[in-house]
Design a protein with these regions (language model features):
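Generic beta-sheet signal
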Residues: 44-46, 95-97, 123, 190-196
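Short acidic-hydrophobic, aromatic-tinged amphipathic segments that line or gate anion-handling sites
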Residues: 152-154, 169-174
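Hydrophobic, well-ordered secondary-structure elements that form the walls
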Residues: 36, 48, 87, 103, ...
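Short beta-alpha connecting loops at secondary-structure transitions
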Residues: 67-71, 108, 137-150, 167-168
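Glycine-rich beta-alpha junction loops
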Residues: 50-54, 130-132, 198-202
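Active-site diphosphate/adenylate-binding microenvironment
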Residues: 4-83
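Glycine/aspartate-rich loop-and-adjacent alpha/beta segment that forms the canonical ThDP
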Residues: 141-143, 160, 175-210
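Thiamine diphosphate
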Residues: 55-133
Length: 210
């Protein structure tokens, strides 16, 4: 079983390496994570919101310490990422706190920017904006012959929205901008939102409705 496990692990590493060759404009969400890894300090706490684009982090962000990955425990709690990200920073103010969101999930709880600013909680929220509800659109593509209902979004610029609340706002349009932008947001020691425009991504196996 050890050799089988090692074979699976090696295939994963090969797949992740192959993703570094992706080139798209707007970028694919897979292109975000190698660049994010360059900016995350050791021991950074990462909260992963529900959704397709942020969910890619499970396979692409390497967590080497306990209590550094936080998620919704499979309960489909869309939008929990922002509030939980703030909580991780309050619990461990000495650690970097980053939360990963799709645009749909972030819209659920972005009003908590008011909380972050009032209490000066320096958590960094990264919004992968593909202008849709990714999981639901994947289901409709797979199960309803691409008949889409209620899944496409018209969003604000989330970096500008953050600035309206008094937080820091950043925009990273190209993969080469991500690492420096994340590092700058962390260094600001202030509540911050980074918008990254990405393409829609439909997983090979669409999420199944329950």
């Amino acid at each position: 079983w050890k050799s089988e496990f090692q074979s699976i692990a090696n295939k994963r590493i090969q797949r992740l390496e192959s993703e570094k060759a992706l080139s798209a404009n707007p970028m694919m969400p897979q292109q975000v994570y190698p660049e994010l890894a360059k900016a995350l300090p050791k021991g950074a706490m990462v909260t992963i919101d529900a959704g397709v684009a942020p969910g890619l982090a499970y396979d692409r962000v390497f967590f080497e310490e306990p209590r550094t990955m936080f998620n919704y425990a499979g309960q489909g709690a869309l939008g929990m990422g922002f509030s939980v990200g703030l909580g991780t920073k309050l619990g461990r103010p000495d650690r970097t706190a980053v939360s990963l969101h799709g645009d749909g999930g972030f819209l659920y709880t972005c009003g908590e920017l008011n909380t972050a600013v009032r209490h000066n909680i320096p958590s960094v929220s990264i919004v992968l904006n593909n202008s849709c509800m990714g999981a639901e659109k994947s289901q409709q593509k797979a199960l309803h012959n691409e008949k889409y209902v209620g899944v496409d979004l018209e969003n604000p610029r989330f970096d500008k929205l953050a600035e309206v609340f008094g937080a820091k706002g950043y925009y990273a349009e190209h993969p080469s901008e991500i690492a420096d932008t994340v590092a700058e947001a962390v260094k600001s020691n202030a509540p911050a939102v980074i918008e990254i425009p990405v393409q829609e991504y439909f997983p090979p196996s669409a999420p199944t409705p329950r």
